[in-house]
Regions:
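Nucleotide/phosphate-binding catalytic cleft detector across ATP-hydrolyzing
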Residues: 1-162, 170-287, 294-349
């Protein structure tokens, strides 16, 4: 109880959604204070950080030879420990308006099925980034809380969190994840599918930023009411010169077909593993979509058709995970109920 009262006094406490595509930071009492791409630009010669977040993303595919733009997260886990540490230091400092002496307590969301080694890598990165204590919760649980689902009740709630690196699916009841499924197919995989499709069909090479723009403008999981098209500029692989083509929503849907099918099949697997009583609840309550990938046009409609269940989009799908972890900053009992005690919290750097 004493710890609970102490925890509530710290205004420097932070909640973090450390995503493959984007990192969001929620500061207690202030709301979301950082929402930036998970990208760092590093000078190869000096190893110095040139830019982080949005500024670094603007450099993707446009950097000189001595600067490289790095995504330190891959498939929901840390791929580059050193760069992740630098990125977290930057975002934590940004959340505290440049103050370097603050050592916040941090609640962070992690994919449901990552290994102990991967969990430890996240924890170590945060301690090295000057966190005083680290508490981990599954991203699907955090997303459900952020979406306003009644996770403490004895009823089944199903959430599908489509992020940048992973799609995290969970059925939740009584503050616990009853069954879950994680597939390493999400927004970034869709971008890569678009790059490969255009390369294969048009002999045109495009970059990550262009692929993401195509996905946002034209991407869909089910036919649209009105056809859409988009001008794409890239480099012709045969002639080696810049070229412009026009691509349609139907073509992009074809490019994304495998990724969408993988997500839908994972949802089916999770439903098959769900106990009958909780399945009955899901029939009534439906499935809630969260995460940036959930914004893919008509994904909710396609999933509803494929499963026969009602599917809805969270009010703020991009921020659901960080809003959920943010709620735990003010409610230690909630943090305790979602099994934070299973997380290693010792060690400090």
């Amino acid at each position: 109880m004493a710890f609970k009262s102490i925890f509530s006094l710290f205004s420097s406490d932070l909640a973090i959604d450390l995503g493959t595509a984007n990192t969001l930071v929620y500061a207690k009492g202030r709301g979301i204070v950082v929402s930036e791409p998970s990208i760092v630009a590093i000078n190869r010669v000096t190893n110095a950080v040139e830019a982080v977040g949005r500024d670094a993303k603007d450099m993707l595919g446009r950097t000189p030879g001595n600067i490289v733009a790095i995504r330190p997260m891959k498939d929901g886990v840390i791929a580059n420990f050193e760069v992740t540490e630098k990125m977290l230091q930057h975002f934590i400092r940004q959340a505290h308006n440049g103050k370097t002496w603050v050592r916040p307590r941090v609640v962070i969301g992690i994919p449901s099925e990552i290994t102990q080694v991967e969990r430890r890598a996240v924890e170590d990165s945060l301690y090295r980034a000057k966190a005083s204590e680290v508490y981990m919760v599954e991203e699907a649980m955090a997303a459900a809380i952020g979406a306003g689902l009644p996770i403490t009740e004895p009823h089944g709630n199903m959430v599908v969190d489509v992020g940048g690196g992973t799609t995290d699916i969970a059925v939740i009841s009584l503050s616990s994840i009853v069954c879950s499924r994680v597939v390493r197919v999400a927004g970034n995989e869709m971008d890569e599918a678009i790059i490969q499709y255009i390369k294969r069909k048009y002999n045109l090479l495009i970059g990550e930023r262009t692929a993401e723009a195509i996905k946002i403008e034209l991407g869909s999981a089910y036919p649209l009411d009105e056809p859409l098209s988009f001008e794409v500029r890239g480099r012709n692989l045969i002639e080696g010169i810049p070229k412009t083509i026009t691509i349609t929503d139907e073509e992009v849907r074809e490019a994304l077909a495998d990724s969408v099918s993988t997500i839908i099949n994972a949802v089916r697997v999770a439903l098959e593993r769900t106990p009958p009583e909780l399945s009955a609840d899901i029939v009534e309550r439906g499935i809630v979509l969260t995460g940036g990938g959930a914004l893919l046009k008509n994904l909710d409609k396609r999933l509803s058709i494929e499963t026969g269940l009602p599917v809805s989009l969270a009010d703020d799908p991009l921020a659901s995970v960080v809003l959920g972890t943010g709620k735990m900053l003010s409610d230690f009992n909630l943090l305790k109920r979602v099994k934070w005690e299973n997380t290693i919290t010792s060690g400090m750097f």
